[in-house]
A protein has these predicted regions:
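Rossmann-fold NAD(P)H-dependent dehydrogenase/reductase core
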Residues: 2-6, 13-229, 302-306
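C-terminal helical subdomain
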Residues: 9-15, 192, 215, 240-280, ...
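Pocket-edge positions in alpha/beta enzyme catalytic cores
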Residues: 61, 85, 245, 284-287
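A generic structural signal for short coil/turn motifs at secondary-structure boundaries
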Residues: 119-120, 282-285
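A short C-terminal helix-loop "cap" of Rossmann-like NAD(P)-dependent dehydrogenase/epimerase domains
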Residues: 177-180, 232-243
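Generic recognition of well-ordered alpha-helical segments
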Residues: 202, 256-259, 298
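C-terminal amphipathic/interface module of NAD(P)-dependent oxidoreductases
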Residues: 286-306
Length: 306
């Protein structure tokens, strides 16, 4: 347990900062349920599919290639369905959607876990800044495409982050989505995480009663995402010193998305931002319904061109 974790207490849900995926699913029987999780080959995604499978669920797991997805799920005890989905390539996302629909899967939750973080250099692909394209456009295309497969009580869980507070001053730069005017690694990452939050907020309004959409902050965790942020020589120091002081373990970091996707107490809560397995207050941009609606409209416009 980190030093910061030692002073944290459980919230209204009965869980909190120190809760793990095992804690939040204790006593749950997920046999007969199916969960689609993106980015399963490492970190939070790998931990998420581990616990869901151990509780009896069927896993539809995606990675950038079917081989990577298959490898990640090789040791799971329950049924699995490997899926190739490169989120920065719209044709790959559409193919993944078609594969899932053709297979007839009924999804109890979609956990949009994959992402890229704080790319040091501005990277543009398909005319869009890479973090916006991958973290937001790719996932929004996947989720909306899979809505016909969502069960009547299905849940959508978008992996956002407290980094959404670090977005650009405007919130989402809808007139500069290729970051041509100005690029900062954390501003662009924060914008993409704000988009994940706003997407969940707007989707929650559009889903029929019984279905939910929420965004989650996993906490600060030493995962492979830091490979773009720190030199190799510092990554080990970040993991060891950071874990001792404040970082969550991976099972703690994945707990919130697993809780929101599975726990009966979260079944009727929608349109919220979660952290430490409890509803939290987001930034003012994260609560801006006009911005959420504008982002939704812009996203639909972009998707028709990709």
């Amino acid at each position: 347990m980190s030093l910061y974790g030692m002073i944290q207490r459980a919230g209204a849900s009965g869980f909190g900062y120190n809760s793990t995926t095992d804690n939040v699913t204790e006593g749950l029987d997920l046999h007969g349920k199916t969960y689609l999780v993106t980015g399963i080959n490492s970190g939070l995604g790998l931990e998420t599919i581990r616990i869901l499978s151990e509780r009896g669920a069927t896993i539809v797991g995606s990675a950038r290639s079917e081989a990577k997805a298959r490898e990640a799920m090789a040791g799971l005890p329950g049924p699995t369905f490997p899926l190739a989905c490169e989120l920065s390539e719209p044709p790959s996302v559409r193919a993944a959607v078609a594969t899932v629909l053709a297979a007839g899967h009924r999804l109890d939750a979609i956990i949009a876990n994959a992402g890229v973080m704080a790319l040091p250099e501005r990277t543009v692909h398909h005319g869009l800044e890479m973090q916006f394209l991958t973290n937001h456009i790719g996932h929004s295309l996947l989720v909306t495409g899979l809505l016909p497969a969502l069960t009547p009580t299905g849940r959508v869980v978008m992996l956002s982050s407290a980094a959404h507070w670090q977005t650009y001053r405007e919130g989402v730069r809808l007139d500069d989505l290729d970051a041509a005017k100005r690029y900062t690694s954390w501003g662009a990452y924060g914008q993409s995480k704000l988009c994940n939050l706003l997407f969940a907020r707007e989707l929650a309004k559009r889903l029929p009663a019984g279905q939910t959409a929420n965004a989650v902050h996993p906490g600060v965790i030493a995962t492979n995402l830091v490979r773009h942020v720190l030199p190799d020589a510092l990554t080990g120091l970040w993991r060891s010193a950071g874990t001792a002081l404040a970082l969550k373990t991976i099972p703690q970091g994945a707990a919130t998305q697993v809780y929101v996707a599975t726990h009966p107490a979260a079944a009727s809560i929608t349109g919220e931002y979660w952290a430490d397995c409890n509803v939290h207050k987001s930034s003012k941009h994260g609560r801006n319904d006009e911005l959420a609606a504008a982002l939704w409209a812009k996203t639909e416009e972009l998707q028709t061109k990709l």
